[in-house]
Amino acid sequence: MSLLDTGARYQTCIVYPEEMVIDSDGNKRTRPSNTGIPAIARFQVANQSGTSARRAEQDNEGFETEKVYRMRFPRSFTKEHGILGAQSQIEWRDQRWALFGDATVYDSSPALARVDYTIKRY
């Protein structure tokens, strides 16, 4: 049993995984699913890029802000649903969050194996 799977600090969220659709022109594209999956995850504040820091100093502050968090599901979620695609979205604290970039897979040790995501709200 690992603290990566149990323990405190997990919060409820709804996951809208990436799905493939065909548009009216017959092109394949991805988007967040309309159907959400109830889940729990751990959320931690993430460091922001230099671009984010500069944005916060601009005179249009409040109109173009962003928040960035690191998110990790229990390993059982990844076993059941797989790794989320980049178009997936998360509903957490009554707000929609977008996945930012690809998942980060840690697999150097079975005891510490996990998948982390970066989520962002613009």
Swiss-Prot record:
Origin superkingdom: Viruses
Organism: Mycobacterium phage L5
Name this polypeptide is given: Gene 20 protein
